[in-house]
Amino acid sequence: MRRVRRGDTGEWHMYELIQVSERDYYIQSPAKIGLVRLNAQDVCLIDSGNDKDAGRKVRQLLDANGWRLTAIYNTHSNADHIGGNKYLQGQTGCKVYAPGIECSFTRHPILEPSFLYGGCPFKELRHKFLMAQENDAQLLTREALPDGFEILPLPGHFFDMVGFRTPDDVVYLADCLSSRETLEKYQIGFIYDVGAYLKTLEMVKTLRAAMFVPAHAEASGEIADLAQYNIDKVMEIAERIVDICREPICFESILQRLFTEFGLNMSYEQYVLVGSTVRSYLSWLKDTNRVRCGFEENRMLWERA
């Protein structure tokens, strides 16, 4: 186990336990897993990783430290954040809590690929990266939190996503922003509600904490600059879409142009993730009068307003 402090940089090994305060930790993984000591024996998790194997590695860390898992607090229901729930709940009997609509998605994971695809998902969309195993989640309420915890609403990336502030003033930020490296590589990060996402990022810029732990960026004592970088990237994508819509164009052609111009590779997974996000951009741009849409020869076409 290592300790990270403000200003620290370094390479962490996958599933290494990193301490960020007296009682707060995270487990280095594709989507960081928060761990908070509640007393000498009991701990809770903030998210659980992307699958059974992640859950197994978390269990090994718990056993190595003599800790007992009492609860998992899910920030939202994306598969890479709830994938370890079923295994850990089965092994430890811990409770699982998820906020709002996310609780339904956590209890019924088929909802995620169905929502992304817009219909019954075919088998190539029913895999662990888009659909976790079902688990017995309860609705997250303030009463379900350990003493001193605070819920931070972070809507935008997904329906009812939240973060948490702990008694040691550590803020776990879930997926409300991504690292510069991630955005430079993938360009179009997943967003459900662009307007809400931008408002969340503006709020995050004002936050102060002893340490911030985003799921897809390095832990840091400062977050405002990275939040602004994410805002700038959203605006860049939005402007690119508006430019593509100079002439009437259908959704599939917009998506093709974006993949080609950003050098992205199409796959089933990327089609639904980026495709859903581009639809969300179009909705936001339409509602803010940047683009309009209509029908021609039984096709919906988008055009700059």
Report the location of each language-model feature.
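Positively charged, polyanion-binding regions of nucleic-acid-associated proteins
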Residues: 232-248
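Short, Lys/Arg-enriched N-terminal segments with co-localized hydrophobic residues
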Residues: 3-13
